[in-house]
Amino acid sequence: NPQFPSLRKADYDTAQHHFHQPGTAGAECKNCHMIERVYMGIDARRDHSFRVPRPDLSVLLGTPNACNDCHKDKSAEWAAAEVSRRFPDSTHRQPTFATAFAAAWNDVDQKGTAEELLKIAFDHGNAGIVRATALAMLERFASPDLAERSSPVLRDADPLVRSAALPLQQTAPPLLRIERLLPLLQDPMRSVRIEAARSLLDVPTSYVSETDKSIVQSAMREYQESLLA
């Protein structure tokens, strides 16, 4: 398919690929690449990111993996060793955003973690939701310097990323914050406009120029209306 040049044509429904008997649950693509979890106690959903099983991350981070969903009598270490043995030349065991997210969650090595999260946020090879999550996790490391360094993503094409970048600006000086956030008060996406208004709540109106006050006031009204919706 010319739309997906990195995907090579191959027959994946073979024991050489999935290492299971054809026709069994282990041979089904969805059970290895679309693991299922129950949400809200009633709703079973499959992961549509279609990922390669990473039991090595289970060993490192305690995350779930497809292999042990079926092989419940085996350890993650066993699964990781099996995957490594069967796919020794795999390129899918490279570092992933999961390690940075786990470090941020556990407040490990704050400076190094913040740098990794910034890299993830600026990497357009990552999905928008991943980049936005990295920005959201950066809030615990918020500083004027981080506000400055993350400011370019305020102009990102993805509204999810723009919205997630806004809270980081709350540590920026008032005048700089207004300068950076004013365009987002008129963003085409309502969620971005509301988040921009919220991020300016503590800025005194005296910092806003007369020509811009109407823009700020309109955004604040929309923010207030969102609270009553």
Regions found by a protein language model. Name each.
Residues 41, 82, 146, 162, ...:
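Short linear functional motifs in flexible/disordered or boundary regions
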Residues 64-67, 71-76, 182-205:
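Short, solvent-exposed linear motifs at loop/edge-of-secondary-structure regions
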Residues 1-126, 188:
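Primarily the internal scaffold of c-type cytochrome electron-transfer domains
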Residues 127, 132, 159, 195, ...:
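C-terminal luminal/periplasmic domains and tails of membrane-associated envelope-modifying transferases
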Residues 9, 43-49, 79-88, 133-134, ...:
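Composition- and surface-driven signal marking solvent-exposed, interaction-prone regions
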Residues 110-122, 143-155, 173-185, 206-224:
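Amphipathic alpha-helical scaffolding segments comprising HEAT/armadillo-like alpha-solenoid repeats
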Residues 122-126, 154-160, 185-191, 228:
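Short coil turns that connect the paired helices of HEAT/ARM alpha-solenoid repeats
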Residues 96-108, 129-142, 149-152, 160-174, ...:
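Structural detector for internal amphipathic alpha-helices that build alpha-solenoid repeat scaffolds
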